[in-house]
C-alpha cells in the first residue's frame, strides 16, 4: 500500500533545479524513470512534466532512505526530500544536469506494475496499444511537451482576444438538428420520446444570435462534433477557436486574425509570420495549384496550354477543348530521365482523380521525347515548351479534361511529385488567405445547389443580382486561412437581412415552410435589427499539429478515437442497458440474417 503525504508539500518541480538552487532543501515528487544501484550509492532519475532530476541515495546520506530506495522500480510514484548539491560529473544533455538531489527522505506514494509501453520519447508502439494505455502514453515527455504547447496556445489566444475587447461566452452543446453537410451526432430525449437533440457541428447559429443580442465581440474555445468518415487529420469530436464580430467587413476580420496568428506562432513556437499575409482568390488558387488549400512552399504551378493547342487535331486535346474543358500541365524539373515504369505510376495516380490519362514530354539534351509528339505540329510543340518555360532536363505532364478533373488531378499530382522529389522545405511556414469562394455548388444527384460553406454566408456585393440569373457564378464573402497546404481556419461575413436569408434558402431548394421549420428562430431574430457581422473559426487541433511539429492529430488530443471512431481505452461506444433504452423510448431492432 502506498504511503500518504501526511502534510508533505512539493516545493520544486523535477525540471526546475539549477546551480543557483545549490544548498536548498527541497521536496520533489514524480515518477521513477530509471534506477541504478552502484553498490554504496543508488541513483534514481525522477520525472514529472517539467523534466528529470537525478537523485542520489547513500548510506552516508541517510541509511533508512538508502535502503528504502532500493525497493523502487520504474514508474513508481515517489516523494523525495533532500538538499540540492553540485554534481561531480555534470550531464550536459539534461536541463538539470549541473545538480542533483541528496535523498534524505523518501515516501513511496504508489507502486507500478511493469508498463505495457516504454515511458520515453520517440516511442515505437502500435497506435492501438498507445490509445488503450493512453494515460501511460501521456506520461511520455514528448507528449507532455505537446500539451504544454496546447495550453500556451489557448492562453495566448485568450489574452489576445481579451485585450481586443472580446467576451468569452458559451453556447449550447445540446441543440437542434439542422442536417446540411456532415451527419449530426444525435442524443435521444427522455422527456420528449421520439425526439432528439444534436451535438453541434459548430456554434455558427448561436454566435450569430449573440451578435443580434448586442455582444459585438464573442469568442470561445469549444468542442464540435461531426459524424463523418475519419481521415488522418480528422476526429469525430474536435476543438475550435471560434469568434464573431459585429459591424465588420472582410478586411477587419482578416487584419485582426493576422495579428492573432503572428502572436500565437511567435510566442508559442518562435516562428515569425510575415504580415500582411498573401491573399489569393479561389479561382487563381484552383488554376495555379489545383486546390483551394495550396501549398506555396514549392513551385511546379499549373500552366494553361489551351490557347497553345486550341487548333490541334490531337483528339484528346481537341475533345477536351470542344467539351468546354481545358489542357493544362505542370513541369517537373530535372525529371526528363524518369523511366517508363515511373511515368506509368503517375498515369495510374491521376486516374484515381478521374483523369482519363496523362500525356508527357521529356526535354532531353539530344531530343524531345514524347508519345504524343507524332500528333502535334512543330509549332504546337514549340508553343507548349515556350508556355512551360521548359529547359533541358524538364518533364512536362499534361492533363486534358473537364476543368474540375484537370485541376484536381494536376493539383494532387503536384503534391505527390513534390513529396517524391523531396523539394518541400519542411522548416518553412507559408500562410495564404483564400478568398472569393463560390457561394454555391450544384449537386447533380439531388438536382439542387448546396452551400459551399454554410447557408449564412454573405454574397459579394457585385454578385447579388446573379443569385437570380446564374447562382453558380455567385462569389461569397468567405475566406480561409491556409498553412502549408492545410486549412487552418475559415470564416465569412454573414447575411444579416432576413429577406436575403430567406432567398438564400430558396436557392438552396428549401421551401419557405422548410426553412422556417429548421431555422425559424434565426429568421425571427433577424426581424429585430441584426448588425452586419462576420467571424472565423480555427481548428485548434490542427493548429497545435503545426506548432508541435506532428503530422498525427491523435498526438494533440488527450483521449482521441481511432480511425473507426472507437476508443480503445474506454471501449466507447458501448452497449447500454435495456432499461436505459426503455426510458428513452428506444427499441433495438435485430437484423435478420
UniProtKB/Swiss-Prot annotation:
Residues 204-207 are annotated as: Aspartate. The keyword Nucleotide-binding applies. L-aspartate binds at residues 180, 226, 453, 494. It is found in: Cytoplasm. Gene3D superfamilies: Bira Bifunctional Protein, Domain 2, GAD-like domain, Nucleic acid-binding proteins. It is an enzyme of class 6 (ligase). ATP binds at residues 226-228, 235, 487, 539-542. It catalyses: tRNA(Asp) + L-aspartate + ATP = L-aspartyl-tRNA(Asp) + AMP + diphosphate. Its EC number is 6.1.1.12. Keywords: Aminoacyl-tRNA synthetase, ATP-binding, Cytoplasm, Ligase, Nucleotide-binding, Protein biosynthesis. GO terms for biological process: aspartyl-tRNA aminoacylation. CDD domains: AspRS_core, EcAspRS_like_N. GO terms for molecular function: aspartate-tRNA ligase activity; ATP binding; catalytic activity, acting on a protein; nucleic acid binding; transferase activity. It holds the Pfam family GAD. InterPro entries: Aa-tRNA-synt_II (IPR004364), aa-tRNA-synth_II (IPR006195), aa-tRNA-synth_II/BPL/LPL (IPR045864), Asp-tRNA-ligase_1 (IPR004524), Asp-tRNA-ligase_1_N (IPR047089), Asp/Asn-tRNA-synth_IIb (IPR002312), AspRS_core (IPR047090), GAD-like_sf (IPR004115). The keyword Cytoplasm applies. Homodimer. Catalyzes the attachment of L-aspartate to tRNA(Asp) in a two-step reaction: L-aspartate is first activated by ATP to form Asp-AMP and then transferred to the acceptor end of tRNA(Asp). HAMAP family: Asp_tRNA_synth_type1. Belongs to the class-II aminoacyl-tRNA synthetase family. Type 1 subfamily. This is Aspartate--tRNA ligase. It comes from Clostridium botulinum (strain Kyoto / Type A2). The gene is aspS.
Amino acid at each position: 500500500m502506498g504511503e500518504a503525504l501526511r502534510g508533505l508539500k512539493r516545493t520544486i518541480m523535477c525540471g526546475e533545479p539549477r546551480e543557483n538552487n545549490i544548498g536548498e532543501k527541497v521536496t520533489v515528487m514524480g515518477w521513477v524513470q530509471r534506477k541504478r544501484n552502484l553498490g554504496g550509492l543508488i541513483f534514481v532519475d525522477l520525472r514529472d512534466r517539467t523534466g528529470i532530476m537525478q537523485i542520489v541515495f547513500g548510506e552516508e546520506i541517510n541509511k533508512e532512505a538508502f535502503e528504502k530506495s532500493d525497493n523502487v522500480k520504474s514508474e513508481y510514484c515517489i516523494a523525495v526530500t533532500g538538499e540540492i548539491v553540485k554534481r561531480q560529473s555534470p550531464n550536459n544533455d539534461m536541463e538539470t544536469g549541473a545538480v542533483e538531489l541528496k535523498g534524505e527522505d523518501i515516501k513511496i506514494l504508489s507502486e507500478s506494475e511493469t508498463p505495457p509501453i516504454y515511458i520515453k520519447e520517440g516511442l515505437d508502439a502500435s497506435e492501438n496499444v498507445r490509445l488503450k494505455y493512453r494515460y501511460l502514453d501521456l506520461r511520455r515527455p514528448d507528449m507532455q511537451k505537446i500539451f504544454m504547447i496546447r495550453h500556451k496556445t489557448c492562453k495566448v489566444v485568450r489574452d489576445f482576444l481579451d485585450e481586443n475587447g472580446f467576451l468569452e461566452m458559451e453556447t449550447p452543446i445540446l441543440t437542434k438538428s439542422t442536417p446540411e453537410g456532415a451527419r449530426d451526432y444525435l442524443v435521444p430525449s427522455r422527456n420528449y420520446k421520439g425526439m432528439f437533440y444534436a451535438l453541434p457541428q459548430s456554434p455558427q447559429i448561436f454566435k450569430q444570435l449573440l451578435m443580434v443580442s448586442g455582444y459585438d465581440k464573442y469568442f470561445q474555445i469549444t468542442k464540435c462534433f461531426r459524424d463523418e468518415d475519419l481521415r488522418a487529420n480528422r476526429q469525430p469530436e474536435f476543438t475550435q477557436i471560434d469568434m464573431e464580430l459585429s459591424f465588420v467587413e472582410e478586411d477587419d476580420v482578416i487584419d485582426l486574425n493576422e495579428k492573432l496568428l503572428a502572436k500565437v506562432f511567435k510566442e508559442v513556437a518562435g516562428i515569425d509570420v510575415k504580415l500582411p499575409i498573401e491573399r489569393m482568390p479561389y479561382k487563381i488558387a484552383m488554376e495555379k495549384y489545383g486546390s483551394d488549400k495550396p501549398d506555396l512552399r514549392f513551385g511546379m504551378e499549373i500552366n494553361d496550354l489551351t490557347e497553345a493547342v486550341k487548333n490541334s487535331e490531337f483528339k484528346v486535346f481537341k475533345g477536351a477543348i470542344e467539351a468546354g474543358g481545358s489542357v493544362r500541365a505542370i513541369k517537373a524539373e530535372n525529371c526528363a530521365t524518369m523511366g517508363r515504369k515511373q511515368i506509368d505510376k503517375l498515369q495510374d495516380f491521376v486516374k484515381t482523380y478521374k483523369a482519363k490519362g496523362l500525356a508527357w514530354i521529356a526535354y532531353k539534351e539530344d531530343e524531345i521525347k514524347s508519345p504524343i509528339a507524332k500528333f502535334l505540329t512543330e509549332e504546337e510543340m514549340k508553343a507548349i515548351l515556350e508556355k512551360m518555360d521548359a529547359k533541358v532536363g524538364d518533364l512536362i505532364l499534361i492533363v486534358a479534361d473537364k476543368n474540375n478533373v484537370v485541376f484536381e488531378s494536376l493539383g494532387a499530382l503536384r503534391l505527390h511529385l513534390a513529396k517524391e522529389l523531396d523539394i518541400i522545405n519542411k522548416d518553412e511556414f507559408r500562410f495564404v488567405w483564400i478568398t472569393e469562394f463560390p457561394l454555391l455548388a450544384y449537386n447533380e444527384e439531388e438536382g439542387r445547389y448546396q452551400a459551399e460553406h454554410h447557408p449564412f454566408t454573405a454574397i459579394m456585393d457585385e454578385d447579388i443580382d446573379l443569385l437570380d440569373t446564374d447562382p453558380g457564378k455567385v462569389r461569397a464573402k468567405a475566406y480561409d486561412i491556409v498553412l502549408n497546404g492545410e486549412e487552418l481556419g475559415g470564416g465569412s461575413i454573414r447575411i444579416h437581412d432576413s429577406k436575403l436569408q430567406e432567398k438564400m434558402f430558396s436557392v438552396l431548394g428549401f421551401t419557405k415552410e422548410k426553412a422556417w421549420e429548421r431555422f425559424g428562430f434565426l429568421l425571427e431574430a433577424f426581424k429585430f435589427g441584426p448588425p452586419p457581422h462576420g467571424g472565423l473559426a480555427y481548428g485548434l487541433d490542427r493548429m497545435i499539429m503545426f506548432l508541435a511539429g506532428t503530422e498525427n492529430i491523435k498526438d494533440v488530443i488527450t483521449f482521441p478515437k481511432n480511425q473507426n471512431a472507437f476508443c480503445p481505452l474506454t471501449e466507447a461506444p458501448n452497449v447500454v442497458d435495456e432499461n436505459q433504452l426503455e426510458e428513452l423510448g428506444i427499441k433495438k431492432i435485430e437484423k435478420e440474417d
